[in-house]
Amino acid sequence: MNYFELFKFSPAFDIDTALLAERYRELQRAVHPDKFANDTEQQKLLSVQRTAQVNDGFQTLKDPIRRAEHMLSLRGIELSHETTTVKDTGFLMQQMEWREALEDIRDSDDPQASIDELYQSFAQYRAQLTQQLTQLLTSEQAEDALLAADQVRKLKFMAKLHDELTRVEDALLD
């Protein structure tokens, strides 16, 4: 299913999330199972299925990584269950530096400053990746779609590392 069509958007990485939320509420009202309470069982089942599609579509389009994965899947590139790893040596080196910095936080003289520094480093790198991804996803070239898939893999890794950093920060606050 093309969630961009469902929500009446052109396939694009940058979307108006406020408009997405508005269209989500409209679709929810239109397909909500309560609206079909007095209809046939088949109609009720269709309503439940349609509601699930609307919910999944909304969750997919509101999350930048899932949105990019969806755009790539519409072009025949499936990333959701893959095990392909990033081959960019520069990124792999940066990844190792981040991991080391993450491990060193607990022994730091100022753990919060170290955490803030890592968050800032993540934000800068993520902004660069997102800018490149936006450009690659607007291209019609098959090679650019493969490069976009690599950017998504990097963003997925960064999201996991960001979650780890948040857990470390939470543990320090406890």
UniProtKB/Swiss-Prot annotation:
It comes from the Bacteria. GO terms for biological process: [2Fe-2S] cluster assembly; protein complex oligomerization; protein folding. Keywords: Chaperone. CDD domains: DnaJ. Residues 2-74 form the J domain. One of its GO terms (cellular component) is iron-sulfur cluster transfer complex. PROSITE patterns: DNAJ_2. Pfam families: HSCB_C. GO terms for molecular function: ATPase activator activity; protein-folding chaperone binding. Coiled coil: none annotated. Signal peptide: none annotated. The keyword Ion transport does not apply. Interacts with HscA and stimulates its ATPase activity. Belongs to the HscB family. Co-chaperone involved in the maturation of iron-sulfur cluster-containing proteins. Seems to help targeting proteins to be folded toward HscA. This is Co-chaperone protein HscB homolog. The lineage of its organism: Bacteria, Pseudomonadati, Pseudomonadota, Gammaproteobacteria, Alteromonadales. The gene is hscB.
